[in-house]
Amino acid sequence: FVNILPEIDVPGHSLAAVASYPELSCTPGEYYVSPGDRFMVWPGGGQHFYGLIDNTLCPANEKVYEFLDKVFTEVAQLFPFQYIHMGGDETARNFWEKDDQIKALMKKENLKNLDEVQSYFVKRVEKIINSKGKKMIGWDEILQGGLAPNAAVMSWRGMSGGIEAAKSGHEVVMSPTDFVYIDYMQGDASIEPPVYSTLRLKKTYSFEPLPAGVNEKLIKGGQANLWTEQVYNMRHAQYMTWPRALAVAEVLWSPKEKRNWSGFVPRVEKQFERMDAAQVKYAPSMYDPIITVSKKDSTKIIVTLDTEVEGLTIHYSFDNSFPDNFYPAYKTPLTVPAESAALKLVTYKGNKQMGRQMVITMAELKKRAGIK
């Protein structure tokens, strides 16, 4: 059976709520909800968020807690699972800074900064959730300003938040972007649906959810995330899910000493056969070359190739023809001829084509090499 963990993401990610009930924000007024518009910027590598539109609930407003009590009452009745996820991530607090209600709350509760303001909010939300007979879990931002007494932590910004929480005696679910964000590209950008980062199958399979030095009983498990802002239909969602979800599953149900990449690959290939029969879409990216581009003497482009799967041969061309297994096989880093039309690549196992035909234009090679 499957337990469904519902998430009501607060105080950020709450534009739908404040658009419907503007009085719940620190900037009451008329809201315009326009999906796809840019609403936030991420200066400083994504650790702090600056909102262009206020999509946050106001922690100083008692009506917010009355509203959330009603929401979590319904959620608790609908979902039997013992946990409710309250989000807590990516909260743009720049609108709080200017608000007189927030300033008054900070003075009244002796809160030194906005981290402590958010912690005050999280602790009150935990009391609401606990009053429904449920445990609260939230993203690792809920550690900032002081963790709520009984909260569990879902660690997405690496493993460190989860480790910190576990060392403090709190339950943890590991969900780090570097290993289990399956909305990321699975291979080279020239052939994958465009996203801002890459996560290959082999990297996902190397995920170790049990870090050294913590009580393993507090690590409740792991979670892979497929965010769908840039996933446009079900076939696309299937493509992003498989086969990386297979890697996540095997990592979570197998002890570290039992895991072996070379043994995992044939099991994936067997699942590909089943998916083909069921017409389930999956990514064959593990067969495509890994491309690293550098420069030499300021003008020469050097291409280094590798594969995730053992036993593949990479064939290439520079003359705009489509290579097959009769074309040159990659052995050492390639110096791109100045007169090249494009770099085209394909992988074979024996006489069988395994990877997709890949095309890297000269303009793209120069861009990756840092040559203008």
Model-inferred region functions:
Residues 255, 259-372:
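Short, compositionally stereotyped local motifs that mark structural "simplifiers"
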Residues 52, 59, 63-71, 116-124, ...:
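Generic recognition of stable, solvent-exposed alpha-helical segments in well-folded globular domains
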Residues 2, 7-13, 89-91, 141-144, ...:
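An acidic- and aromatic-residue-enriched active-site/binding cleft used to recognize and process polar
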Residues 135-151, 157-301:
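Flexible, acidic glycine-rich loops studded with aromatic residues
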Residues 3, 15, 58, 192, ...:
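Domain-scale activation on soluble regions of proteins
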Residues 9, 15-20, 96-98, 164-165, ...:
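Short, solvent-exposed loop/turn and secondary-structure capping segments
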Residues 1-134:
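Substrate-binding cleft of carbohydrate-active enzyme catalytic domains
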Residues 3-7, 56-58, 83-87, 137-138, ...:
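Structured core elements
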